Amino acid sequence: MSFPNSSPAANTFLVDSLISACRSDSFYSSSASMYMPPPSADMGTYGMQTCGLLPSLAKREVNHQNMGMNVHPYIPQVDSWTDPNRSCRIEQPVTQQVPTCSFTTNIKEESNCCMYSDKRNKLISAEVPSYQRLVPEPCPVENPEVPVPGYFRLSQTYATGKTQEYNNSPEGSSTVMLQLNPRGAAKPQLSAAQLQMEKKMNEPANGQEPTKVSQVESPEAKGGLPEERSCLAEVSVSSPEVQEKESKEEIKSDTPTSNWLTAKSGRKKRCPYTKHQTLELEKEFLFNMYLTRERRLEISKSVNLTDRQVKIWFQNRRMKLKKMSRENRIRELTANLTFX
């Protein structure tokens, strides 16, 4: 890259020529500290004119000392960027200080302020000395604290309520954590409360589980229809095998290994059907999976069940068949696959 002359004014624009996106090859005069690209015949006016800041230069026009900056309404701060004596901006040193800002009186300030007070400002200024050149001092406001919007604000009722509720906490740092992080502050206390609840649930679980199970199952049997109660009576008289199965399940539930977390191994049915009833229903299901209302009424009379019970049995049987067919299909697919 060749420069026409090695004047100090030309050296000042070296950084600008490398950084600026609107500039290509160098063309500047030694008389005025001005830098513009040479206009070519193909592209016409090129360079800073596209930015809308400087007027274009015609060919062989060198005398542009009095050229000014056009200020447009969408860039109102252009005047403050440039020096009054120069028509183009020179890079300023890094140590330029940001002017101190002040809040206007017509802006509404929040009543509750940020938790970072004067102590926090002193700590920040002591810990980060490298930023003192850019931000020399905090903005002067009437209050020394910075106003924060409402969604960042700490609710004072939350803090006082939590500290009163958990007065027995030995650590004094919990209040500081509550101020800095209101969401995560109550986690240790909540975990302790959960542990106490689990202990209370675990202690009576081993001794009182069979009684709870009987109490839960008895209202289900009592709340059924009178026809279902008659069905229960018929089942208890006609099928002693079902009673033996239920007694075995109760014995299994009495073992100390089963607690309130684990469910029972077997499912106690509310109204199990007899062998004769299931046989007749299975025959009808093999003949036809879906029943009409007339056929359902006939079967319910012959098997001594209600219309609703027959309907529910067929629904469950269809779901069972669907599940079995799905499992068989999966088994066949996995059997055909060979894993190397």
Swiss-Prot record:
<comment type="similarity">
    <text>Belongs to the Abd-B homeobox family.</text>
</comment>
<dbReference type="InterPro" id="IPR020479">
    <property type="entry name" value="HD_metazoa"/>
</dbReference>
<dbReference type="GO" id="GO:0000978">
    <property type="term" value="F:RNA polymerase II cis-regulatory region sequence-specific DNA binding"/>
</dbReference>
<keyword id="KW-0371">Homeobox</keyword>
<feature type="modified residue" description="Phosphoserine">
    <location>
        <position position="238"/>
    </location>
</feature>
<feature type="DNA-binding region" description="Homeobox">
    <location>
        <begin position="266"/>
        <end position="325"/>
    </location>
</feature>
<protein>
    <recommendedName>
        <fullName>Homeobox protein Hox-D10</fullName>
    </recommendedName>
</protein>
<dbReference type="Pfam" id="PF00046">
    <property type="entry name" value="Homeodomain"/>
</dbReference>
<keyword id="KW-0238">DNA-binding</keyword>
<keyword id="KW-0804">Transcription</keyword>
<dbReference type="GO" id="GO:0005634">
    <property type="term" value="C:nucleus"/>
</dbReference>
<dbReference type="InterPro" id="IPR001356">
    <property type="entry name" value="HD"/>
</dbReference>
<keyword id="KW-0597">Phosphoprotein</keyword>
<feature type="compositionally biased region" description="Basic and acidic residues">
    <location>
        <begin position="242"/>
        <end position="253"/>
    </location>
</feature>
<keyword id="KW-0539">Nucleus</keyword>
<dbReference type="InterPro" id="IPR009057">
    <property type="entry name" value="Homeodomain-like_sf"/>
</dbReference>
<comment type="function">
    <text>Sequence-specific transcription factor which is part of a developmental regulatory system that provides cells with specific positional identities on the anterior-posterior axis.</text>
</comment>
<keyword id="KW-0805">Transcription regulation</keyword>
<dbReference type="GO" id="GO:0000981">
    <property type="term" value="F:DNA-binding transcription factor activity, RNA polymerase II-specific"/>
</dbReference>
<feature type="region of interest" description="Disordered">
    <location>
        <begin position="202"/>
        <end position="268"/>
    </location>
</feature>
<feature type="compositionally biased region" description="Polar residues">
    <location>
        <begin position="208"/>
        <end position="217"/>
    </location>
</feature>
<feature type="modified residue" description="Phosphoserine">
    <location>
        <position position="239"/>
    </location>
</feature>
<dbReference type="InterPro" id="IPR017970">
    <property type="entry name" value="Homeobox_CS"/>
</dbReference>
<keyword id="KW-0217">Developmental protein</keyword>
<dbReference type="InterPro" id="IPR046333">
    <property type="entry name" value="HXA10/ABDB-like"/>
</dbReference>
